[in-house]
Amino acid sequence: MSKNIQRQRSISSISSRGVDRDRDPASGGLGLLSPYNSRSPLAGLHHSPGSLDATANQLSRPTFLLERKATEDIAKLDGVLFDDIPTLGSSNDHISSLGAGSPYPTINTSLAVTNPNYLSASSPGGPRRRANTASGPLSPAPPASPIDRLSKTTNRGSFVPSTARQPMNSQPPAPASSAPPPKQRTTSPSVASPPSQTRSQTVPYLSSNFGPTANMYGQRQPSGVDPSRPFHQVPLPPPPMSPPPAIGTINSIMTNIPPPPPRYPSAPAAAIHLPGPPGAPPPSGLPPPPGPPPNNTTNWQGTWIGAYGSYIPPPPPQQTHRPYNPQPYKTVNGQTIAIPPPPPPTESMQMSATYIPQGDSYGEGVGIPGLGMDDMAAWSATSQSSWLGGYNSIGSLAPTNASDTAASTPVDAYGSHNRDNSTTSNATSSGASGIPPELAAQWPLDRVLDWLQANNFSNDWRSTFRALDLHGNRFLEVGSANGGRGNFGMMHQLVYPRLAAECISSGTGWDQPREREEGKRMRRLIRHIVKGETPGTGMSSHTRKESISNTSLVPTSAGPDSGSPDTPIKAPGPGFSVGHPGGNHRKLLVGNFDDEGAHRRSPVASEPSEVGITFTERSSSNRGYSPAGSPAPTPGLFSSSTAPNLASSPGGRFGGHRNRNSTDSVSSNAAIYGSGVPPDASQVLRSQMNFGDMAKDTRRYGHDGGNRPSPLGDNASNGDRSAGASEPPGSAKEGKSFLSIFNHRKKKHHDDPDSPTSPMQHKSHSLGSRGNASETSLERPGSSVSTSHEHNTPASSMRSRRITTGRIFILATLDYWNYRMVDVSDVESASDLRQLICINLGLPDADGAQVYLTELGKFDHEDPLDDSQLVANKKVRADAAGSLKVFVRPGNMAGLAVNIGQSQNALSPAHLPAGAKMDEDTYARLNGQRRRSSSSPPASRQNTLTGGEHGKPTSTGADDDENKDPKSDDIAQQAEAHRIEMERKQQAYLAKRKHARENGNSPSENGTGSYTGIVGPKVIDFDEPRNSPFEDKKPFDSAFAPQRRAPAAPLDPSATLIKANSLSKRGSHQRNSQGSVDGFPSKRQGTGMTESPKHISEKRKPTNERQALGGIGAALAGMGRGLGGIAHPGGAGQRGTSPNRSSPGSAGESAGVASSTTDRGEDAKSRKPISSGNVSPTSSARTVSDEPPQLPKVVIKPRIFDGDSSSDEDSDDDSDDGLFAKPLAGRGGDDAAAKGKEPATKPVAKSPMSKHGTFWNDADSDGDEDPISESASNLNKRPSLTVNTKRGRKGLSVTFTSPDLPSSAGSKTAAGDEDDRSSRGSKRTPNTPHSEGWDSNNDKDVKLSRRKSFMEKDTSIWANRPPTDALINNLEDFFPNLDVDQPVLEEGELPGDLPPSPIAEAEEPHDQQQAKSMTTSRISNLYNDSDTLGSDESTLKALERPASIVSVARKNTRRSGGLGRMKSIREVAHKRYTQGAGAPPPVPAAPNNSNNSSSSGSKNSNLMRRKSTKMFNANIVQIRPERGSMILPQIPQDHLPSLPHNANNQIPKRQTTFRWFKGQLIGKGTYGRVYLGMNATTGEFLAVKEVEVNPKAAGGDKNKMKELVAALDQEIDTMQHLDHVNIVQYLGCERKETSISIFLEYIPGGSIGSCLRKHGKFEESVVSSLTRQTLSGLAYLHREGILHRDLKADNILLDVDGTAKISDFGISKKTDNIYGNDKTNSMQGSVFWMAPEVIRSQGEGYSAKVDIWSLGCVVLEMFAGRRPWSKDEAVGAIYKIANGETPPIPEEVSAAVTPVALSFMWDCFSVNPEERPTATKLLAEHPFCVFRDDYDFDQTELYAKIKGTWNTK
């Protein structure tokens, strides 16, 4: 292994623990890995002449070592140092102790041996170790050796360095590079290795050409842990002696290094910061920036930098700089500017944050960019420690230059700052903060401790500072390092850990948030100390000599400039920063990331050509121009242009770099502590996004929103300001996350604002930001070109506010209509709050503005809020939702005149109050006669400028004052003329409408049908009829042509007036039924809102000519679908319109096509939306069909009837309860209607439809006749219509009826028929049985009690689940919300044709074909695809079932050859449960015999229950009627007609969809309710257990609710695959977000517990049978590994045929060892049925034998008729059970039952579970469970009690 590689590894392994080797006097500057160290593993290695001095061979290395220090002390070195690196001499004891190290070496001037290789570097893990001081406090300087004298005379012209030591206090130090090798070489070393070489393969020598005054060549970054090295000012480096060679290596630039100037006069003679090596002088003659050392063969550059993860700074630009020419910048705004920009870097000077090594880089890893190449002369993005920031960032002190002040000229500024303009973006590498050593010397430890006490810091803080010895420079850097942010590394690595220990030791306790706030306060106070301020005053401006790193170049303002319309200064290059005023400006990034005044350009927005060109060029280059031609604002007037000026990234706090496309500052510092930047900011900027992309501003670039100057200030984002302040700013509109950085930050004001006409106020953009007028530009305020202005608001406090709390908004308005959202999160004082509100509202001045509390719609304000009230309301009422709303009445605004002297904000169009009277005038005045219409949203304005053409720069300052008044007067005159013209047009428009109305509602001249009734704001005249605005009047020749739309409104206004309120309460998306007259024009205005209360919406044009037909013709429109007849089931497709919803004059369905309902009756293909040009902005979008409907092919002779007018009086109550109470057969007054009697006086269901002759079909009668018998004769009857033109009363322009049908032929009048049909044909809101609104207002005889659960109708009913026969014959009772006779299922799609389920468990009857051939009154021949139920517009469209389309096509195919066959719910259920001849069910059927429960019918029902279809893993969909209707949508069936069936006539397997209907409530439990359900696919009845998580139980936490729902899955998973005759079968489940529906097998009857409570105890034979069945089910469960754990009489269902079934597995548990004690079993179950081991488990668990104990309790319960432990309460029972007592058997039970029964109970009550028998053993061996052949449940007393419970007729 070569020596060089060894040496490289030596450097790479330098210690990072930060312990200064100065502390070890014996270190001697030798590293443990030095080949000259006898204790080093490298000792004895051969050293080539390339690294050793050949002339020093006279001396032996060990001798020299022994002369300096004891050899045995070398081992005490904490780290490893390269031995031949010179250490700093007697002048290094005041080097700053902070910083991450410098890429430049230091030299030991005290060594007697001259060796150019004595360089020191730090390890990758931490700060570079310090060089040993020769005369410092830790070690004396060694005496001079003969090598010094030798090197003075050897090889003068070669690269042998000079060894002359110069006293630091007398003259600049010589670059003594002592080297003590055994021999010294006399030949010049070769040039440094090429870039491809690994780092530190060669160590460059120092050239002796520099003479005795040459020093080492780099700045030095002080350590963060060295208290002995206070910060020191850097002297000015001399100009270079010669240009560097154009070689892309590290040595190419290291030539002609001059001696440094004298050190700082007052500095101690211990430490000095050596300036960086200069580069080639720019052609302009400006002083050069620092460069790397000259051609030295020492290889510290490559190794050092990589050693601690930093980057070497690039050299200054090598290209020819553009000479300074201030003229283009002077003429931008017609005025001169104080400071023009310096020459910019070229585009080649670009390096991104992710450095990609090029051919000229060298070193390990990604390498270090080569120095000296022209193409590398770029602003370093990854290392802002560039030549611009040499002094500030790396630690070299700024030179003492009298001209280097804030008032220096641009040349002076550049000359003094071009070497120190940038800093690194890393906190660890942004070292020196420019603290004068005199100031540091004023803060010894005692004063620091006293200062802490004086500022109310706790004793823990004082102890911490005392223990850490924080004083002087280290103390001041805590708050002022890193661009004013403070030294976070020290705070988090030293101070906070020590403070935590102190707090714990002192007993006060470590409160991290509190101490962090204290730390922020401390840093803020220290920053004030460094700035020379008091905390309460504005920070003093600091000159560049003392400036922190990020205020490097730009001259800052002479004083604070709060409130002044400054122009932000665009710095010309990296490190150049701009000052910014404090007042009334928002900043995009939190605290600007640079609260000390150094704003940087965004890495993304800064394009390569942005620097050094004139403002005109910049504003039009790259992204500077708005693509839509949005005019660039006047640079002097608005401190912004259209370029997307991104915020400076967090690195801005560490230095003002403006590297184009550089993202290192954000990517590396976005999420650092206290930066206030959301974590995703780094990723956003890394992906080259600008804030316009992030905010997704729809108004960007001007053409869809407009970039106008904002009322929030010169720099406010124009994209989120609107002309009327009617929209919230972007910071408010956008969400949290990264966009929260758009927040407004209110800065404190300063007392000395510049004059509005001050030359420092209106500066051109020569140095200004070019982007702040962009669509999402930085919200950072502009700055005048003067001293960098510091904000009062500390950055730390701003960051803490931004991080800790959410934003608070208030809504402010000037005109009651448009509200501006104002972010008041950080505003505390009333004056600031008023100022902020006024700024957001565009008021130039908050003086005199009065603030009132307001609410939406409030127009009167009396008492303004004083300051205390304003602050109190803000604290109490303001929140993130903007609950606090204020109205602001401007104070001294004379006619909205703009006071330029106050603020340039007033010149923004968005500055004006929205909705003000002179909004048009003001906008025209501000936009050069450009007006905006009243309908145009304010936010749609582009970025327009004041008083000039778009994009044309105008003068500012006093010139604006001179030009403003004549212009304003002219604009005001024009605005007044415009207003008069608008009023004239409005009057003409209203007159035209009035004239059209008086002329018989004829269309207006422009073809728009007139409409009236709107008088003033929202005054609607319902008594004045009008034509629909959507109709075209056309001749009456096509009056009888069929139309899809309903006829025009009748002249009778009563229905409209009566139902207006009722229908206005309805939703806006209800479906129109086809049988209704649903499109009548209404007098109601559309739901859309007009722009102004005084303006009518724009004129509407007709959309459909066919709608112009008059009353009779229009009435024919929907008749084809509305006719009743045999072939059309009773209102199947036409029953959708409720009587009190679809009256011809229904006001809710306004204006024909303007109906607010969705036209579900139209085929989607036959409708097209109205063009936007024909619809008023206020009218909702509606669809109109231009295609006439298909007329019915079947015509039936009708009879005419006049609608019953018995219900002329109606109320506006929209409840339709009682309208549809269908009479049941065999009940009181209902029989009369069923028998054909005409109850003439019986009140008809209140409905305006009956008044206007609305038809109803009578296809599904309730009569006793069998509809089949008359089906043939009914087929010959064709429905038709006759028109009665004699209008005997209002509203009867059209009357129609349906032909006589079996149930009503000759027996019912039309009115009676209508009443009967309304019982189930009308729309009904499907309320649950116990929901509100069930009570009916109808007659008591008509009203039924089915509004409640049928289990409550008769208290004599023991069971709550009727047999299936009773269900079939009383379906309308149990499904009250459905029309059970509506044909919704095609016969071919019923289970008879295709298996509805993958599990085709039930065999289909062979006589299906007979049923198919039969036609009844329920067959529909008019049920076509244009109907609601047949179209995809139905509610099933949401299911996206392709089968729906297939079903329609199949029906159409079938319809072309004949009539289709539709089945109703009643038929499906009857077919499922009746295995008879396939005849349609009687409606109602004749009463069965009393023994039907035990007859074959009962057995068939039981058989069908056993074949219940399981629906697990299938798609389960609940079918609900449309809201407000009983009509079901069409049910697309699961069939694949396009796929051929196989030989077995089976369809391919796929996921089946089961659809079910929800019926009555049949049970309630602790955890949910049980409803009757029906599987529409199979016709099976279901018990649907709905368990809904109570939000209160979950505390309103949705996640917790979901967890509770997930817990319910246990029951389903447990029972999914179980199948036993004595267990309730689980058929499926439907999971929802907060509820779950479990589908169970429907078991008629009730629970054993309910039967016991009703009928008393059971006889022993019944108990034995039920016990045997329960035990059989229990044994099955145990075999399956399931513990029931809640077995009791209430959880065992008793069927009406005597079958027992175990149910309720809610707390069941599945286990592998059913009879082994499971310790995880907890106390579950019901107390009185619990086994002893459950109560006293004590961690031992229990087994399935707990169910045996519970079964014994159930047996005792059946014998006694009451629960066990009936005389004890729960607590007492628990106590007794835990003590081993068994449930007492009452004496009457003991005397009545047999000993076998007693022995069974005693066996079950075995206290020891080991002695308790298992279920299988009891079932097989116990005599009580023996099956008895003579047992017949039908012959028992229990059956005699319950046999008459349900009448199945």
From Swiss-Prot:
InterPro entries: Kinase-like_dom_sf, MAP_kinase_kinase_kinase, Prot_kinase_dom, Protein_kinase_ATP_BS, Ser/Thr_kinase_AS. ATP binds at residues 1562-1570, 1585. SUPFAM superfamilies: Protein kinase-like (PK-like) (SSF56112). It holds the Pfam family Pkinase. The active site is at 1686 (proton acceptor). Residues 1556-1825 form the Protein kinase domain. GO terms for biological process: MAPK cascade. Keywords: ATP-binding, Conidiation, Kinase, Nucleotide-binding, Serine/threonine-protein kinase, Sporulation, Transferase, Virulence. It catalyses: L-seryl-[protein] + ATP = O-phospho-L-seryl-[protein] + ADP + H(+); L-threonyl-[protein] + ATP = O-phospho-L-threonyl-[protein] + ADP + H(+). Its EC number is 2.7.11.24. PANTHER family: MAP KINASE KINASE KINASE SSK2-RELATED-RELATED, SERINE_THREONINE-PROTEIN KINASE BCK1_SLK1_SSP31. Mitogen-activated protein kinase kinase kinase, part of the mkh1-mkk1-spm1 MAPK cascade that regulates vegetative growth, conidial formation, colony surface hydrophobicity, osmotic stress, cell wall integrity maintenance, carbon and nitrogen source utilization, chitin distribution, septa formation, and pathogenicity. Belongs to the protein kinase superfamily. STE Ser/Thr protein kinase family. MAP kinase kinase kinase subfamily. This is Mitogen-activated protein kinase kinase kinase mkh1.
